[in-house]
Amino acid sequence: MTALENKCAIKMENITKRFGSVVANNAINMELREGEILSLLGENGSGKTTLMNMLSGIYFPDEGQIYIHDKPVTIASPKDAFDLGIGMIHQHFKLVDLFTATENIILGLEGKLDLNNARKKVKDICDRYGFDIDPDMKIYDMSVSQKQTLEIVKVLYRGADILILDEPTAVLTPQETDKLFAVMRNMKADGKSLIIITHKLHEVLDVSDRVAVLRKGEYIGDVMTKDANQQSLTDMMVGHSVTLNINRPEPINVTPRLKLDGLTVFDELGVKRLDNVSFTINAGEVLGVAGVAGSGQRELLE
């Protein structure tokens, strides 16, 4: 059965959320189907995270009704969301650095806890979906990618069959992103339903089945990913045609203003932070420096 033929895992009817005089979400009607990866797109401030925070129990809607598997529900707290099988992986991780992966996963659970059984269950989840996590590794020894992976394993351990990932690739390398998407496809194949919030259009086209778009707190519509491209999605996000290919004029004065040649930097612990970095900035030029967190941008500017 395809996602098109599946029932709704989530149905949101006329969901409205206000913060004082600001309407963050206005009468939103949106669905997530069972066994589907849905990308939620929108500019900054369009209301994406606010909408998802109502599904995860952080906010409560001022108006409207949420249905989970066709049943009307009230989600007044994160516990309500967990009890309904909804798990949200936030941009900022909620892990205790001094604890192991397994200890973080069972932290806060009620009843008698068996660490050995928990460790085995964590390993089973990792093997099932393709996660690469050592159940006994301390959080302070983990990379950013491993911490994010652990957050996903944590919600699966607690029984989530609906997962919401808020900007999951913002801190990942391209290789780590590919690995995450492979895991997401494994979860989808196992019947999980997923929502991914992202700004990266090429990732939307790569991993999702369907795309829903918000603009200024309003639900604009949805489109099957196979029928979309970066241009059409951008137009939906901003409300008018946008030129993605920008041709900038060449600077008239190409006099070098700053030149780096083979710059290498070690931090106070002797760790190499920059290795043989070279570039030239000319007059009238804007140079962009890109990289995931910890790639050396701060050391370069300092």
Stretches with model-predicted labels:
Residues 2-302:
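Glycine-rich phosphate-binding loops of nucleotide-dependent enzymes
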